[in-house]
Swiss-Prot record:
It is found in: Cytoplasm. It catalyses: UDP-N-acetyl-alpha-D-muramate + L-alanine + ATP = UDP-N-acetyl-alpha-D-muramoyl-L-alanine + ADP + phosphate + H(+). It comes from Vibrio campbellii (strain ATCC BAA-1116). GO terms for cellular component: cytoplasm. Its EC number is 6.3.2.8. GO terms for biological process: cell division; cell wall organization; peptidoglycan biosynthetic process; regulation of cell shape. Its main location: cytoplasm. ATP binds at G129, T130, H131, G132, K133, T134, T135. This is UDP-N-acetylmuramate--L-alanine ligase. It comes from the Bacteria. Coiled coil: none annotated. InterPro entries: Mur-like_cat_sf, Mur_ligase_C, Mur_ligase_C_dom_sf, Mur_ligase_cen, Mur_ligase_N, MurCDEF_pg_biosynth, UDP-N-AcMur_Ala_ligase_MurC. One of its GO terms (molecular function) is ATP binding.
Length: 485
């Protein structure tokens, strides 16, 4: 399916004159990856953007540099001049800005509703799934950019080649990460939808019922028009089970023999994955992917499937795969350093679900077989730790050295027996690895200094503030004397 992408922004804006009545858009929680991306696109479209967050970060600083007004802290006065208020899933009804907006009768919309407005008159490509959304979104973006199509994109993480997680393009293409955590991706009405995989996560949203989660993904795909396309990973057993229930054109990808876009002969050489992509009716592609892991080969094949259906040249696909710099905090190689006791490599990864942690460990083992793997793991949310406790224990015992931080609560209250200390006890009892529990994150550099050896691969893992620790360790160059203070 070849799509005409030449419609310009002036034409898109002319289609929605009512939206131009909106003068000021306020984002509560503007510093988050998903919120900031939409804010940046709207800012570049000419809207007055304000927002609030609990603290400054590089994202808020970037928005301010582009003309946004960002308040630190949440207070009622921040929304007084807003035409509409956008809220993230982390914002509750007791937030003073939400309460003030209701009092002032200012419309309140969720992040996905605003993303849906951006997508309404564009050729939308939405990327959903439990794992791999951010990297897949970045790879689709990279291909379309390499093809000269200048897409708008809104991603849940930094697209390193672009230096941002969102950008307003000049074409009518919009590539967006679609968030299933609160089922708000049902607001989106794209032309193409990718589903990478489906696992039990964010189950509180779905009443603890996996069947409800599966049906929600089907409903998401049925938001496609009848001429739209569902690009799905047939390697995933849940997706394979659901395919007969999808009443849209389905294109499959994966390592499976019956995949429409099939991966063959995968092997990893350090940071790069190399494999062949087989497509019916098209030439095979010998891919060099500049990010490691079989899971990233799957993400790449999803992007290749979309591009193939849109008749994008093989040359653009190959250049995008070889040239990708990946995404922030996804097997993010922060450097190799002289520690004072030899050399060590530092990698930072956002994965916080057992499946994500497992594929990251396998990528590290495959690319650097001679290195001792030292993982600094921070569990994310007490509820996830409780629900996936045994899975976490099974995965984490694969590393050589495990340094465990306590749970990053993300607003949740503690749950007895579902914390870092309990996980350490369980893993230690199995006898494969003796975890080191670090109750205060500030203690981590000195603890690591007493563990690190020549040739180590240090992997910081998790969705909380362990990413800040990774940057701190990089700034200290993993130097033992500096880490000891």
């Amino acid at each position: 399916m070849t799509i005409q992408h030449t419609q310009d922004l002036a034409q898109i804006r002319a289609m929605v004159p009512e939206m131009r009545r909106v003068k000021s858009i306020h984002f509560i929680g503007i510093g988050g990856a998903g919120m900031s991306g939409i804010a940046e696109v709207l800012l570049n479209e000419g809207y007055q953007i304000t927002g609030s967050d609990l603290s400054e970060n590089p994202v808020t600083e970037r928005l301010v540099s582009k003309g946004a007004t960002v308040f630190i802290g949440h207070q009622a006065s921040n929304v007084e001049k807003a035409s509409v208020v956008v809220v993230s899933t982390a914002i509750n009804e007791e937030n003073p800005e939400v309460m003030a907006a209701r009092e002032l009768r200012i419309p309140i919309v969720r992040r996905a509703e605003m993303l849906a407005e951006l997508m309404r008159f564009r050729h939308g490509i939405a990327v959903a799934g439990t794992h791999g959304k951010t990297t897949t979104t970045a790879l689709v973006t990279q291909i379309y950019s390499e093809a000269g199509l200048d897409p708008t994109f809104v991603n849940g993480g930094l697209v390193k080649s672009a230096g941002t997680n969102a950008r307003l393009g000049s074409s009518r293409i919009l590539i967006a990460e679609a968030d299933e955590s609160d089922a708000s991706f049902l607001h989106l009405q794209p032309m193409v939808s990718i589903v990478t995989n489906i696992e039990a996560d964010h189950m509180d949203t779905y009443g603890g019922d996996f069947e409800t989660l599966k049906q929600t993904f089907i409903d998401f795909l049925h938001n496609l028009p009848f001429y739209g396309q569902a690009i799905v990973c047939i390697d995933d057993p849940v997706i394979r089970e659901l395919i007969p229930r999808i009443s849209r054109q389905v294109i499959t990808y994966g390592f499976s023999e019956d995949a429409d876009v099939r991966i063959e002969d995968y092997h990893q050489e350090g940071q790069q994955g190399k494999f062949t992509v087989v497509r019916e009716g098209r030439a095979n592609l010998d891919i060099t992917l500049n990010i490691p892991g079989r899971h990233n080969a799957l993400n790449a094949s999803a992007a290749i499937a979309v591009a193939t259906e849109d008749d994008i040249s093989d040359e653009a696909i190959l250049k995008a795969m070889a040239g990708t710099q990946g995404t922030g905090r996804r097997f993010d190689h922060l450097g190799e350093f002289d520690t004072g006791n030899g050399h060590a490599m530092l990698v930072d990864d956002y994965g916080h679900h057992p499946t994500e942690v497992d594929v990251t460990i396998h990528a590290a083992r495959s690319g650097w077989q001679d290195k001792r793997l030292v993982m600094i793991f921070q569990p994310h949310r007490y509820s996830r730790t409780r629900d996936l406790y045994d899975d976490f224990a099974n995965v984490l015992e694969q590393v050589d050295v495990l340094i465990m931080l306590d749970v990053y609560a993300a607003g949740e209250k503690p749950i007895a027996g579902a914390d870092g200390r309990a996980l350490c006890r369980t893993i230690r009892s199995r006898g494969k690895v003796d975890p080191i529990f670090v109750p205060e994150i500030e203690q981590l550099p000195s603890v690591l200094a007493n563990v690190i050896q020549d040739g180590d691969l240090i992997l910081t893992q998790g969705a909380g503030d362990v990413g800040k620790v990774a940057k701190q360790l990089a700034a200290l160059e993993l130097n033992i004397s500096k880490m000891l203070g």
